Amino acid sequence: YTISNRSAESNLHLVEKDGTLCMQDNANRNTDFSAHWTWVREEGTPLSYSFTPDGVTDASFWGIRTAKAISPTEIHSDYHGEKVWKLSQDISSFPKFSTENNLLIEALYNMALEEMLMDVRSDSTFRAGALWPDTWTRDAVYSIWFSYAWIMPEVSRKTLDKQTLRNPREALQDTGSGGSWPISTDRVVWALAAWEYYLYTGDSSWLEGAYEGLSYTARKDIHVAFDKRIGLFKGETCSMDWRTHTYPNWFTNVTIGSSFSCGTNALHMFMYEFLSKAAGILGKPESE
């Protein structure tokens, strides 16, 4: 792919050089670039969408679809019929983002803050989404990891506590192919949000409970989901967790449950990194 950026007088390109994507030698990043980017395939045909400072245009077999920011608090779109978004929630207590050169990004940021508030349940935990009214581990964890830990720390903590089983403490596994654990073992994603929450709050007493729960989770998974011959954990993919998005139709639940997902194994590795760091902070003995 080539990425071109339309400046006031010419098209400037990012080009492949030594295996990386970089600016042309004569390009000045401070003066030559605007907020209009166009992606072009190697064959030379533009992709079906383009961005401008205040909108995006998408051309497909459905026709031309556009979304345009009218202001930082209003977007007009005809992607799924004529629709208008206007900010309706009070977001004044959250970090403010502004830009002189991209109104669309500013409006989308404000929309994201509003949707965050709308996703808080009556029990002060995050719901998975409009069609998933309860709390789900993986959905909430990624949001907490990305930013919610410091934007809404109290709701983040309550969400993590809700997604923790008791007696003994362990991370709660969302449903997946074949039901849940151990076909799916990505509950260890809980560690991502737990560490992010600790980094923001420095709450060592909460870290103690998180360490206890993830320690038991690790011991349980090492006995049930770890393949010593391969050196990897079994289990379904995370993030794109609907099997129709990630596996061919001929994959059965048994096949998925005995496969080794790269992303899920990366999460297991992070959990062990969490346990190592937390043990050092809490002064745990090396035997643990």
Cite the ranges covered by each PLM segment.
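Signature tryptophan residues that serve as conserved aromatic anchors
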Residues: 37-39, 136, 242
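Lectin-like carbohydrate-binding module/patch detector with strong preference for beta-trefoil
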Residues: 1-77
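The feature captures the catalytic groove of carbohydrate-active enzymes
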Residues: 61, 68-71, 172-188, 222-288
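Charged, glycine/proline-rich intrinsically disordered loops and linkers
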Residues: 76-88, 245
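Active-site cavity-forming subdomains of large catalytic enzyme subunits
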Residues: 213, 217-225
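Solvent-exposed, charged/polar functional surfaces in cytosolic regulatory/catalytic domains
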Residues: 111, 115, 220, 274
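Substrate-binding groove/exosite segments of carbohydrate-active enzymes
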Residues: 81, 88-208, 212-215
